[in-house]
Design a protein with these regions (language model features):
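Glycine-biased, small-residue-rich flexible motifs in mid-sequence functional cores and linkers
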Residues: 3, 45-208
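Short, small/acidic-rich helices and loops at N termini and domain boundaries
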Residues: 1-57
Length: 208
């Protein structure tokens, strides 16, 4: 393929990506507009879903310094205790058996010592980190790439429910939002932003 055709294809892809991103942005804004409706808020509360804005007292203080912090956070259960340490544990979905064991053991030990573990409830390292955190007894928190009422991956529904017993499920995406691919890299900034330290248990060299 000559350079002219390459440039045409690159421009076409760029324009298409812009259209997709604009559509996603407008859909997100439409959802957030609903937050001005008190009846909508009451409906969420009946579903056990709470909303906190960047202007609210309960908004996580750790996120405030960041320019790209989410304007709103939706959550079920509760938010991390700001007076206790928070450690994020993340890593590969397709991880080794050794990685799973280490994630679970380390999370359990940290949790036994009063450290709140936060992760993304994804397959692999995230899942085993949160299982270990539950075994340690200190509340753990999951930041999802979907709405807080959408358990993803679906096979983690038991883990999802166990986290809610003492901890919380958090998302910047409105209830009902599906697990769209572009949500996940963005939610990572919330995981790291809420944490005092981040532990990458196992990951490929160019992992997200």
């Amino acid at each position: 393929m000559d350079n002219t055709n390459k440039n045409i294809n690159q421009n076409a892809n760029t324009n298409e990506n812009k259209k997709i991103n604009n559509k996603r942005g407008s859909e997100y804004k439409e959802q957030l507009e609903k937050l001005k409706d008190k009846n909508y808020i009451k409906k969420l509360e009946k579903q056990g879903i709470k909303v906190v804005s960047v202007n609210d007292r309960d908004y996580p203080a750790k996120l405030l310094p960041y320019d790209h912090r989410p304007e709103y956070l939706f959550y079920k259960g509760r938010l991390p205790d700001r007076d206790k340490p928070v450690v994020a544990m993340v890593g590969a979905r397709a991880c080794s058996n050794y990685g799973r064991k280490m994630a679970r053991a380390l999370a359990r030990e940290l949790s036994e010592n009063g450290v709140q573990i936060i992760s993304g409830m994804a397959r692999g390292i995230d899942t085993y980190s949160q299982i270990g955190a539950l075994e340690g007894g200190t509340p753990t928190f999951a930041v999802l790439g979907s709405g807080v009422d959408v358990c993803y991956p679906t096979e983690n529904i038991e883990l999802y429910n166990d986290i809610l017993k003492n901890g919380g499920i958090i998302s910047e995406y409105p209830p009902g939002a599906g697990p769209i691919a572009w949500h996940f890299p963005l939610r990572n900034r919330i995981i790291s932003g809420l944490s005092d330290k981040v532990i990458v248990v196992e990951a490929r060299e160019k992992s997200g």
